[in-house]
Amino acid sequence: MGKTSQKTITRLKRQVRVRKKVTGTAERPRLNVFRSANHIYAQLIDDVQGVTLAAASTCTEGVAQSGVHTGNKASAAAVGAAIARVALQKDIRSVVFDRNGFLYHGRIQALADAAREAGLDF
């Protein structure tokens, strides 16, 4: 079995600490972000009902482009704009941002800024 790196353990501790304070409702869902080496994913989650209201990622058809590297800030900004577009179609204007233990920097910040510019309020 492989060992979990100290960096991952620290991120998971931050995730638990943030998750204790942040919950999403139907009126103001939680905008959850997950970042991997090659992709970035965003979901709008209603924690009361336990359902995902909307999702977008660099794997989604409208966002992904063939032959383009998706592990960069430009792709993260495209995902932020896409999740905001889907949220506004479902009359969701205000969300709670859950960075999922990742530092608010780089691709996470680019996604959040693009979602704000596209009309989400958080």
From Swiss-Prot:
<dbReference type="GO" id="GO:0006412">
    <property type="term" value="P:translation"/>
</dbReference>
<dbReference type="Pfam" id="PF00861">
    <property type="entry name" value="Ribosomal_L18p"/>
</dbReference>
<dbReference type="InterPro" id="IPR004389">
    <property type="entry name" value="Ribosomal_uL18_bac-type"/>
</dbReference>
<dbReference type="GO" id="GO:0003735">
    <property type="term" value="F:structural constituent of ribosome"/>
</dbReference>
<comment type="subunit">
    <text>Part of the 50S ribosomal subunit; part of the 5S rRNA/L5/L18/L25 subcomplex. Contacts the 5S and 23S rRNAs.</text>
</comment>
<dbReference type="GO" id="GO:0008097">
    <property type="term" value="F:5S rRNA binding"/>
</dbReference>
<protein>
    <recommendedName>
        <fullName>Large ribosomal subunit protein uL18</fullName>
    </recommendedName>
</protein>
<comment type="function">
    <text>This is one of the proteins that bind and probably mediate the attachment of the 5S RNA into the large ribosomal subunit, where it forms part of the central protuberance.</text>
</comment>
<keyword id="KW-0689">Ribosomal protein</keyword>
<keyword id="KW-0699">rRNA-binding</keyword>
<keyword id="KW-0687">Ribonucleoprotein</keyword>
<dbReference type="InterPro" id="IPR005484">
    <property type="entry name" value="Ribosomal_uL18_bac/euk"/>
</dbReference>
<keyword id="KW-0694">RNA-binding</keyword>
<comment type="similarity">
    <text>Belongs to the universal ribosomal protein uL18 family.</text>
</comment>
<dbReference type="GO" id="GO:0022625">
    <property type="term" value="C:cytosolic large ribosomal subunit"/>
</dbReference>
